[in-house]
Amino acid sequence: MASELCMNCFSVKGQYEVCPFCGYVEGTKPKQPHYLTPGTILANHFIVGNAIGFGGFGITYKCFDTTLGVVVAVKEFYPAGLVNRAPGECSVGLLSGDKQNQYQAQLKRFLMEAQSIAQFGKAKDIVNVYDFFEANNTAYIIMEYVDGVLLKDYLERQGRMEPEVALNVIHPIIEAVKKIHAKGIIHRDISPDNIFISD
């Protein structure tokens, strides 16, 4: 089945090398050499597609859950400056030096983030967390996939954002952060790299 799916849009493209739905070319290398290769299988049922975001704590991929038959987002714990990965490999390795304690502390925080966000269930403007697991010397959070445009990409294409538009983007973020803070949780990774603008 994986060979018939487009690794960008997850439509069934059949044996075509170029997806007739989105134009993605099968076998396209990841944008960064340390990203997982599209087509990689995680936990025996998540097919990794293209990376859709990268922040200080990790890489987010668009993936296909073969068990449920739905597109999900998978955030991989990949803390910048602490780990590396050879192109085409799945496992991460710690950079040299005394990074083990720092890595373990951040990994624990990453997994606690998954548990914390999962308690919000279907709260408006907060992405649902479905599951999390450890593999490949790192960890993964399985989340709801939100179809939209990254704020970073929007700003790069459109330039300056009009004040009314900015307020419409920022207001739901403020409301979501209020809900999170009310539970004693601090979101440490709010940035244009992980804010989606959706319809």
What is each model feature region?
Residues 136-150, 154:
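Conserved short submotifs of the Hanks-type protein kinase catalytic core
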Residues 64-72, 78-82:
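Conserved N-lobe loop of protein kinases adjacent to the ATP-binding glycine-rich P-loop
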Residues 86-119:
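AlphaC helix of the eukaryotic protein kinase fold
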Residues 49-55, 60:
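Protein kinase glycine-rich loop
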Residues 197-199:
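Activation-loop N-terminal segment of eukaryotic-like protein kinases
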Residues 169-170:
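Activation segment signature within eukaryotic-like protein kinase domains
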Residues 132:
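Activation-segment/catalytic-loop signature of the eukaryotic protein kinase fold
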Residues 173-185:
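Protein kinase catalytic-loop region centered on the HRD/HxD motif
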